[in-house]
């Protein structure tokens, strides 16, 4: 039945192992999470959301799991998978943004980081998703009671202003 199929392939794991997608590179691990489960004409189906590590492409991910997403007990549909958005640390864009961060905050300890989240920046060319996050602070991102301190928001505005100046100079 579908529940057995789902539990064998997805279950409570978010690492993609059940569909042959367990993969990690130096920037992070692939994540695979349940999307929408629905019943239509007596058939249960679900979608999955996959966030792809930097060194994989969407087509490779589809090929890796194609034969493991359907059997007599169910079918899992893969929604749109976007190729990762990535710029190396040496990129002029990354350098301009990081310099703005350091100049405003004085923080030279924390470096630019790569995350696996989705972003509208993927819709444009030569764009980087960029935002404030203090390491060690739990902002409850995408959860109940998500927040940012007013002082950190004010600092972020100054970083964004400096970042715009730096980007205009490229």
Write out the residue ranges for each language-model feature.
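An extended, acidic, His-containing surface patch that forms the Zn2+-binding/catalytic region
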Residues: 1-33, 38, 55, 75-170
């Amino acid at each position: 039945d579908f529940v057995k199929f789902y539990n064998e392939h997805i279950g409570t794991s978010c690492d993609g192992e059940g569909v042959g997608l367990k993969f990690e590179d130096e920037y992070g691990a692939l994540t695979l999470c349940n999307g929408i489960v629905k019943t239509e004409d007596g058939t249960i189906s679900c979608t999955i959301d996959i966030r792809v590590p930097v060194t994989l492409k969407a087509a490779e991910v589809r090929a890796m799991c194609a034969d493991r997403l359907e059997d007599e007990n169910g079918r899992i549909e893969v929604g749109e998978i976007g190729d990762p958005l990535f710029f190396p640390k040496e990129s002029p864009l990354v350098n301009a943004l990081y310099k703005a961060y350091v100049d405003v905050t004085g923080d030279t300890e924390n470096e630019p980081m790569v995350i696996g989240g989705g972003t509208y920046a993927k819709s444009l060319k030569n764009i980087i998703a960029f935002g404030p996050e203090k390491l060690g602070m739990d902002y409850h991102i995408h959860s109940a009671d998500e927040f940012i301190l007013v002082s950190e928001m004010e600092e972020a505005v100054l970083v964004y202003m400096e970042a715009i100046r730096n980007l205009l100079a490229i």
